[in-house]
Each structure stands twice: as C-alpha cells, then as structure tokens.
C-alpha cells in the first residue's frame, strides 16, 4: 500500500513539475514576443515623422494636378469598347493590421461593377490577395516597394512600365490606395487619372496658354500618372507605418496582459507544488510512525 502511494505521489509531482516547466517556457516566449513588438513599435514611431513629411511633399503636386483638371473641367471618357485600368497600391510588408486586406476588398468591390477591368498591383500584399480571387484581372505587378518612403524616381519607373503596358488605351485609369484619415484610422480611397484623349476633350482645356506641341496632352497624362502614383504611395506608406505602430502597440499591451496572467498562474502552480510536497512529506512521516 505504501509503495503504491509513493508511486502515485511521484507521478503527481512529475506532472506538477512538467506543468511548471510548460508555463515557464510559455512565459519566456511571450516576454520575447513583447520585446519584439515594443522594438517594432519604436521603429514605426521613428519612421512615422519621415513618412508624414514625404506624404505632405507629394500631396502638393497632386493638389496642383487636381486644380488643373478641375479648371479644365476634365472628366473620364465613356467608351463601351474600352476597358478600365485599376492601379492598386499597397506594399510588400505586413504586421500592420487589416490595412492591406481592406484595400483588396475595395478593389474586389470595384471589380464586381467592372468585371472586365485590368488590375496593376503595386506591392506583394494586394497582389497575393487578388491572385486568390481575381487572378484573371491581374495584368502585372510590382514588388520591392514600401520599405522606405517613395520617391519620384521610383514612381516614374513604375509609371513608365504601366505606360508601356498600354495605359493610354484604357478609357479610365483609377488609383486605389489607403488614405490616412488620422494617426489612428485610414480608409481605402480611389481617384481617376485622365488620359490624353480625356484631357484633349476637356471643355475648358483651350483656355490655357499652351505652346504648339502635339504631344502636350500625352505628356500631361504621363506626368500626372507619376505624380498621382507618388502621392498615393506616400499616403499609403504613412497609413501603413501608422497602422503598424498601432498594431505593435496593441500587441505589446496584449503580451503584457498575458505575462501578468501567466505569472499569476505560475506562482499559484508553484505554490501548489510546494504545498503538495509538504503534504507528501508529512504523510510519509506519519506512515513511518
């Protein structure tokens, strides 16, 4: 009887020690994750000011373009035989909440209205999501973006590739991007980019003093495309960095809560193990008497 009880005590103690080791391992893992998320939050906070400067700088050119087309009364062309082109802008990086999936959702909603539209994906995140649901619409994609604030040189190269792909042949070109509403929120937005034909047919285009140049409307389209992509990428980058900072802040808080819970559980389990061992020692001593 005594031998059987001893074996039971050993098994019970082993289980308690195993549970303690599991809790301790889990606790160390969560603490390491908390260190990573706190570091990523600091990095995102540092990059946010640079992203805001890039956004404000790029936005000035976009506002100048918008004022020109407003004064020219430019509108997209209506041509049933031609397709629309959607330029969807995200980045290659994740760990920033639902910012990429929200943009992909907005693009999918647009594709329900214009199912024959072509899509150019800028960034691996939107490309990956659209490949799963709308692979037939995806014309081509760019990656290696979103690591730093965009530059005009970078967006000019992207715009040139899109133009080489026949952007001038579409009746309407639209850019979809994440617009930072505040430091805590964003929303997917879209804006048109008017092609050369739409510019030439603007009711008030003739009011502007323009040198005799047959390619001026095409030059305007190409320059505007680069500007609008730059502004959208800069705003999207600022929204992403802000979203990543918020996501890492929430992750750090959640990790802190889990650390507190597991610390309490560890201490209670350790206390229970010590109590059980004392009971076993006292019981064993009583049996010997």
From Swiss-Prot:
The keyword Mitochondrion is assigned to this record: yes
Membrane topology type: Peripheral membrane protein
One Gene Ontology cellular component annotation held by this UniProt entry: mitochondrial inner membrane
Transmembrane regions: none
Keyword Membrane recorded: yes
Key words of the record: ATP synthesis, CF(1), Hydrogen ion transport, Ion transport, Membrane, Mitochondrion, Mitochondrion inner membrane, Transit peptide, Transport
UniProt subcellular location: Mitochondrion; Mitochondrion inner membrane
Coiled-coil portions: none
Top-rank lineage group of the source organism: Eukaryota
GO molecular function: proton-transporting ATP synthase activity, rotational mechanism
Pfam family, one: ATP-synt
Functional note: Mitochondrial membrane ATP synthase (F(1)F(0) ATP synthase or Complex V) produces ATP from ADP in the presence of a proton gradient across the membrane which is generated by electron transport complexes of the respiratory chain. F-type ATPases consist of two structural domains, F(1) - containing the extramembraneous catalytic core, and F(0) - containing the membrane proton channel, linked together by a central stalk and a peripheral stalk. During catalysis, ATP synthesis in the catalytic domain of F(1) is coupled via a rotary mechanism of the central stalk subunits to proton translocation.
Subunit details: F-type ATPases have 2 components, CF(1) - the catalytic core - and CF(0) - the membrane proton channel. CF(1) has five subunits: alpha(3), beta(3), gamma(1), delta(1), epsilon(1). CF(0) has three main subunits: a, b and c.
Protein family: Belongs to the ATPase gamma chain family.
UniProt protein name: ATP synthase subunit gamma, mitochondrial
Gene that specifies this protein: ATP3
